[in-house]
UniProtKB/Swiss-Prot annotation:
Segments passing through the bilayer: 8-28, 53-73, 74-94, 96-116, 138-158, 170-190, 239-259, 277-297, 309-329, 359-379, 385-405, 410-430
Gene: MFSD11
Modified residues (Phosphoserine): S204
Protein name stated in the entry: UNC93-like protein MFSD11
Source organism of the structure: Homo sapiens (Human)
Subcellular localization: Membrane
């Protein structure tokens, strides 16, 4: 196998492994609050929203140290160990206890930070400037396809269910745990890419030991430098402006990945299909994500108008979705009790409108995330690690805050928070993009400012 073929093989395996893991984890997150509401009728008392708040809070803090962990352990072993913790979190739902549920939430927060840092490292070492776009697209498509399979199973398995029984819960989460473990094991199929600088056969063992020691020192130096650069980048004008946009992506991530599915499952007006509709909602979020990511990935090379039109499309799509959700869903749906809510929405609650909104949420999310990743890669091509660490830090801490307030705020207040952040986040993105375009037009190096 040629070096290029080996790298492409690694990217495909990386994407398939993440597809299996996140088929399990995203399905788990989508149904967690609904399952826990059924559990709260027993001796178990917990909140899926609180669990996700813990996960994203720990995740954001852990981003500060994970580059050092990956540098020492290596990306492959880091991803494998993280996968085990993901599987452990999912397995907790088979027979949950509050202490194990929240403890696992802490561990998976750390594991998530390690996993995504290692994923970025693995993607980078298996790509060059010519293949990074293609490889990112392959990984994105495989990752987002995870939204289909688990949610498709939920749709058919929970058809006609109004309450989730112990047998239903165990069957689903045993299957999801096995799926997650399959993805975890797949990381061992990733091969080490051929090194461009291989040690000569005539080199002595002393020379090799010296290079190993120097390599370890270099890894430590790089980790410290990245840590320092992260703090310096935090206070630059461009990063502060983009942080508002990033904060919005964290809030809407919480909404479409956890809150919206819960709202659908709690709306009794949907009848016997309310629980299975959670799975169908997840499928259409995935369709929106994949369609948007694929479309904007293909258009990126021929886009004469920059990134702003895509972001504008994203915010318009999201505002339409928020307005329809406001009209179609009862206000108390996010915090409804175990039996759901019989409250009326402003219009007669429609399953078709609910699923349309799922698609719009996914499409809008892909607009924002693809363009944020693009502009960060452009502005900070020489400091990509600390730049993306800040991106993940801001996004995850805002997601944690949103999961926390989702326990208490009615639907219309949650939508209002997203509308405010979405509006100002779009304006701030436009400002940075206009400055970047102006520097390109003048032939200046934007990275020098």
């Amino acid at each position: 196998m040629s070096p290029e073929s080996k790298k492409l093989f690694n990217i495909i395996i990386l994407g398939v492994a993440f597809m299996f893991m996140f088929t399990a984890f995203q399905t788990c997150g989508n149904v967690a609050q609904t399952v826990i509401r059924s559990l709260n009728r027993t001796d178990f008392h917990g909140s899926g929203y609180t669990s996700m708040a813990i996960i994203y809070g720990v995740f954001s803090a852990s981003n500060l140290i994970t580059p050092s962990v990956v540098a020492i352990v290596g990306p492959q072993l880091s991803m494998f160990a993280s996968g085990l913790f993901y599987s452990m979190y999912i397995a907790v739902f088979i027979q949950p206890f509050p202490w194990s549920f929240y403890t696992a939430s802490v561990f998976i927060g750390i594991a998530a930070a390690v996993l995504w840092t290692a994923q970025g490292n693995c993607l980078t070492i298996n790509s060059d400037e010519h293949s990074i776009g293609r490889n990112s697209g392959i990984f994105w498509a495989l990752l987002q396809s995870s939204l289909f399979f688990g949610n498709l199973y939920i749709y058919f398995a929970w058809q006609g269910k109004t309450q989730i029984s112990e047998s239903d819960r165990r069957t689903v989460f045993i299957a999801l745990t096995v799926i997650s473990l399959v993805g975890t094991v797949l990381f061992f199929l990733i091969r080490k890419p051929d090194s461009e600088n291989v040690l000569g056969e005539d080199e002595s063992s002393d020379d090799q030991d010296m290079e190993v020691n120097e390599s370890a020192q270099n890894n430590l130096t790089k980790a410290v430098d990245a840590f320092k650069k992260s703090f310096k980048l935090c206070v630059t004008k461009e990063m502060l402006l983009l942080s508002i946009t990033t904060a919005y992506t964290g809030l809407e991530l919480t909404f479409f990945s956890g809150v919206y599915g819960t709202c659908i499952g709690a709306t009794n007006k949907f009848g016997a299909e309310e629980k299975s509709l959670i799975g169908l909602s997840g499928i259409f979020i995935g369709i929106g994500e994949i369609l948007g990511g694929s479309l904007f990935g293909l258009l990126s090379k021929n886009n004469r108008f920059g990134r702003n039109p895509v972001v504008l499309l994203g915010i318009l799509v999201h505002f339409i979705a928020f307005y329809l959700i406001f009209l179609n869903m009862p206000g108390d749906a996010p915090i409804a009790p175990v039996k759901g809510t019989d409250s009326s929405a402003y219009i007669k609650s429609s399953k078709e409108v609910a699923i349309l909104c799922s698609f719009l949420l996914g499409l809008g999310d892909s607009c924002f995330n693809t363009q944020l990743l693009s502009i960060l890669g452009f502005l900070y091509s020489e400091d990509s690690a600390p730049a993306f660490a800040i991106f993940k830090f801001v996004q995850s801490i805002c997601a944690a805050v949103a999961f926390f307030y989702s326990n208490y705020l009615l639907l219309h207040w949650q939508l209002l928070v997203m509308v405010i952040f979405g509006f100002f986040g779009t304006i701030s993105f436009f400002t940075v993009e206009w400055e970047a375009a102006a520097f390109v037009a003048r032939g200046s190096d934007y990275r020098s400012i």
